[in-house]
Amino acid sequence: MEVYCLFMMRKKEKVITMTVTLILVVILICIKVTHFVIIERPLKQCRIVSAYHLTVNTNGAQIDQSWLFEKDDLTYIDIAKTFEQTYFVTDYAGGSSDSGALNELTIAFGETMDGMPDIRITVSENGYIQINGKRAYPLSLKYAGKRLYVHLLGCLQDGADLQQ
């Protein structure tokens, strides 16, 4: 009888351990899926619909490139969710390691009566995003700035490859 009780207790401990392990695995899978759906997937979407003016200045040579992004392409920038206008790139200042300048990409949202953008988001390669505009409080925040910067530059590069 004692042996049977010990056997049953060990079996019960194994069942509890397996249940706890299974619950932890399910939680980890849910976290990974949520991370992929909310963060990773939007970063991989990149559709360029039509051109706007963008000047890239590289060592004195100016290259005109410009692209209009569809609204859904940039909705993973939190503040962008409140705007219904199309987004367009207004400026890209390319820096080099020699000059110490930072690469910067500015995106404008909508346009006011005086031709100024409602909101400007500047993404720097140091990982900072600066947001300015009449309808937003100016702020600077450390975000997934590097990833966003690389993604947007990838969009521009994809567009340039498509045009050639």
Question: Where are the regions a protein language model picked out?
Answer:
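Function-determining sites in protein domains
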Residues: R10-Q164
